[in-house]
A protein has these predicted regions:
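Penicillin-recognizing serine hydrolase domain
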Residues: 1-140
């Protein structure tokens, strides 16, 4: 991870202390946007289309049973987005939605949230979706 982060200029991305806990990778919204920028403008077309196609085809329910139709994936038009979730470090729910919100691929949005465990996953999803809707509206 350190090699790729250095190559792509992602100064705030760090591997987790325990490599088996990939969900504890530290990153910033800025680094997420820089990574998407690399995918959109720095990769061969075939590789870019493979990644964006997979993101755009994300199912509403993830393999682990978690509902991921929130944030950028909850709105219209359909987005190409990577969702992230984890509970409950320091009493917080971590819920992220980052990707390309428009079919023209003109914009990249990174929504990274850490919310009190008490709001529950439904409340956390609603918050991230509300923010995604607010961000997406002026981009249309």
């Amino acid at each position: 991870m350190a090699r790729v982060a250095a190559r792509l200029g992602l100064p705030e991305t760090r591997a987790p202390r325990d490599p088996s806990q990939w969900g504890e990778t530290v990153l910033s919204a800025r680094d997420v946007v820089l990574l998407y920028d690399h995918v959109l403008s720095g990769m061969p077309t075939e590789d870019r289309e493979l990644i964006i196609g997979a993101l755009a085809a994300a199912p509403p329910i993830a393999t682990d049973g978690f509902g991921q139709a929130f944030g950028l994936l909850a709105g219209a038009p359909p987005a190409a987005s990577k969702q992230g979730w984890m509970c409950c470090q320091a009493g917080q729910i971590t819920l992220h939605s980052a990707g390309i919100p428009d079919p023209g691929r003109r914009f990249v949005v990174a929504l990274l949230s850490s919310q009190p465990r008490g709001v529950g996953y439904d409340g956390a999803r609603d918050t991230v979706t509300d923010v995604a809707d607010a961000v997406r509206a002026p981009l249309a």
